[in-house]
Every structure is written in C-alpha cells, then in structure tokens.
Curated annotation (Swiss-Prot):
Modification note: Acylated. Acylation may be a prerequisite for conversion of the monomeric 37 kDa laminin receptor precursor (37LRP) to the mature dimeric 67 kDa laminin receptor (67LR), and may provide a mechanism for membrane association.
Protein's name according to its UniProt entry: Small ribosomal subunit protein uS2
Main location: membrane
Domain of life: Eukaryota
Start-end of each [DE]-W-[ST] repeat: 230-232, 245-247, 276-278, 286-288, 304-306
Length: 306
C-alpha cells in the first residue's frame, strides 16, 4: 500500500514503538477473516500480528480520512475507557467529531433526536464494543474504519487496521500514529522532523493512579514547606524593622556632645573659658555677706536672753 516509496516506509523507530506498546500481540482466539493479518502463533497460544500489514492499513485509513474535505464530517468513537482519551486527542489534532463514552442509539438514523449526525466517515476503536454505531452506519451507507484484534468481527467494517485494541498503550499509540499520518498527508507537519506531541498524551490513565500521584505530590509539597519553615521561623519572629521600634520607645536624655579638637597644639585655646570661671568670685562675696549679717542678728538675740 505504500507504493514502494521510501518516504512511506515504516521506520525503525516506529517498529520499536509498536513492540514497546505490544501492538503486535493479539489474542488466543482468531477470526477467519483476520487470518491474513497473522504472522505466527506463540507456544502459549497468542497470535502475533504482522506489523507490515498494520502499517499498510494505517496508511490506507489515513488516506481515507484526508479525502474528506470537512474534517468535522469524520466521526471517531470509543465506548471503552482505554480509547476515550485517545479519541479526544485525535479529534483535537485532526478536527474530527469525537463521541467518547456511551453511543446513543439512533444518532445516525433517528432524525428527531437532538444528537442526530450525518458523518461521511466513521472510525471506531473496537468493532465488538462499538457494534451499535457500525450497525447504524451500514443503514445509512457510511464507510467505516476499525482497529481490529485477532478475534474481532469484521462485519460492516470497510478498512480493518490489525492491532492490539485491548491494551491501553497499544490503543493510544495507534490513534497517535493515525493522527500523525493524517497531519503529514495534509501537509500540516513535515516527515523530516519528528512530531512534537508525545504518544503518552494518548494513553489511558486510571483515575485511581492519578489520585495517588496527586496525593503524593501534595504530601511532598507539605513536607517541603515544613522543612523550610523550621529554618525560616526564627527569622520571621525577629524582623529587622522591630529593632527601630525598640529604640524609639526608650527615652534617652539629650546630652550635648563635646567636640574636641583633632590636633593637640590647639588645646591652649581653651584658656579664655577658664578666665570666665575665675570672674565669678564677685558673686561669692554676696553669698558670704549674707551669713555674716545673720550671725550678728543671732548674736544679738543671745545677748538679750543673757
């Protein structure tokens, strides 16, 4: 299906991704219409899918999606939890219309209900789980693409992509590969450079695991804050701004500061001040005069008593 072009050939890094995600591992049961996509059977009864056929069908499905002029006319569906996140990511990347979760019967056939749609192409994750949209698509002549495992029924499926549609990593990787090929064929991204979007964003994550990771992150953050608080608490109790307040509250008597000359030869200049102090004996005479007068008065009284 690649036409012998080197550009469309499967790269080694793509094969490694397929093997790491377990895309080549099928089930223990085999549908007679899926025999053409089987490479070998393991000793434990698990069938191995031929990844070359997987890549060819992936390119064919991408060509069918690109052929639709309006991307919103492509409807991607996944009723299983493992493919809901991948379907939403694929829809945001390619512009398709997603239906994640339960498919309302009559969406393609009942024109009265509000959820009625008329897509031009239908892509499902599991033909067995998504049998209702496949059946309704056959009523209104909508071509269908499906990710099929070794035991998947191919009734009403036009393009079957053989892969492991049970594993969360395999389903996410297949939707990531399909989105990348669609964008490459549209010319949105180049084949020479790798796509910046990682396949991990298409993988299903268990809500319990997400909650555990959030709790672990919260506990780590609290312990880090407590550790930092033990060292920073004394600094917070005695800020530098409070030292100025203590100095303002204490009343310090104002004492004039005596300025001393810096050079010693200028010390004799203080002699005039000494002369000023010596000029005060005039006032001392006044003090000495008063006691003498009082003494004479007291002596006078004593003479009278005698």
């Amino acid at each position: 299906m690649s036409g012998g072009l080197d550009v469309l050939q499967m790269k080694e890094e793509d094969v490694l991704k397929f093997l790491a995600a377990g895309t080549h591992l099928g089930g223990t049961n085999l549908d007679f219409q899926m025999e053409q996509y089987i490479y070998k059977r393991k000793s434990d009864g698990i069938y191995i899918i031929n990844l070359k056929r997987t890549w060819e069908k992936l390119l064919l499905a991408a060509r069918a999606i690109v052929a639709i002029e309006n991307p919103a006319d492509v409807c991607v569906i996944s009723s299983r939890n493992t493919g809901q996140r991948a379907v939403l990511k694929f829809a945001s990347a390619s512009g398709a219309t997603p239906i994640a979760g339960r498919f309302t019967p009559g969406t393609f056939t009942n024109q009265i209900q509000a959820a009625f749609r008329e897509p031009r192409l239908l892509v499902v994750t599991d033909p067995r789980a998504d049998h209702q949209p496949l059946t309704e698509a056959s009523y209104v002549n909508i071509p269908t693409i499906a990710l099929c495992n070794t035991d998947s029924p191919l009734r009403y499926v036009d393009i079957a992509i053989p892969c492991n549609n049970k594993g969360a990593h395999s389903v996410g990787l297949m939707w990531w590969m399909l989105a990348r090929e669609v964008l490459r064929m549209r010319g949105t991204i180049s084949r020479e450079h790798p796509w910046e979007v990682m396949p991990d964003l298409y993988f299903y994550r268990d809500p319990e695991e997400i909650e555990k990771e959030e709790q672990a992150a919260a506990e780590k953050a609290t312990t880090k804050e407590e550790y930092q608080g033990e060292w920073t608490a004394p600094v917070a109790e005695f800020p530098q701004a409070e030292v100025a307040d203590w100095s303002e509250g204490v009343q310090v008597p104002s004492v004039p500061i005596q300025q001393f000359p810096a050079e010693r030869p200028e010390i004799p200049a203080a002699k005039p001040a000494a002369e000023d102090w010596s000029s005060q004996p005039a006032s001392t005479d006044d003090w000495s005069a008063a006691p003498t007068a009082q003494a004479s008065e007291w002596t006078g009284t004593t003479t009278e008593w005698s």
